[in-house]
Amino acid sequence: KRCYRTPDLKSQTCPPGEDLCYTKKWCADWCTSRGKVIELGCVATCPTVKPYEEITCCSTDNCNPHPKMPKP
C-alpha cells in the first residue's frame, strides 16, 4: 500500500498491516487565517473521529492527496 504522508507530502510505502490511507483535518489556533491543519498517512483501521476533526479513509494506492495538490 502506498499513501501520501505528511509533512513532506510524498507518496510512501506503508508499514506492514497499515492498509488504509487517511486524511485528517482540524482547526488549530491559526485556523481563521491559514485554514485547517491537514495530516496524511497510513493506518491499520480508520481512526475514531473526535468532534473537532474530519477524517477520511480510503483503500487504494495514493487515494489521500493533499487538497491543494494538483491532480495527476
Curated annotation (Swiss-Prot):
Disulfide pairings: 3-21, 14-42, 27-31, 46-57, 58-63
Question: Which InterPro entries has this protein been placed in?
Answer: Snake_3FTx, Snake_toxin-like_sf, Snake_toxin_con_site, Toxin_cobra-type
Entry superkingdom: Eukaryota
Looking at the keywords, is Zinc present?
A: no
- Keyword check for Heme: no
Q: In which tissues is it expressed?
A: Expressed by the venom gland.
Q: What Pfam families has UniProt attached to this entry? A: Toxin_cobra-type
Recorded hits in SUPFAM superfamilies, A to Z, give: Snake toxin-like (SSF57302)
Protein's job? Binds with high affinity to muscular (alpha-1-beta-1-gamma-delta/CHRNA1-CHRNB1-CHRNG-CHRND) and neuronal (alpha-7/CHRNA7) nicotinic acetylcholine receptor (nAChR) and inhibits acetylcholine from binding to the receptor, thereby impairing neuromuscular and neuronal transmission. Ranges of nAChR inhibition are in nanomolar (competitive binding with alpha-bungarotoxin gives Ki=8.66 nM on muscle nAChR and Ki=9.47 nM on alpha-7).
This protein is called Long neurotoxin Tx-NM2
**Per the UniProt entry, what species is this protein from, by scientific name?**
Naja melanoleuca (Forest cobra)
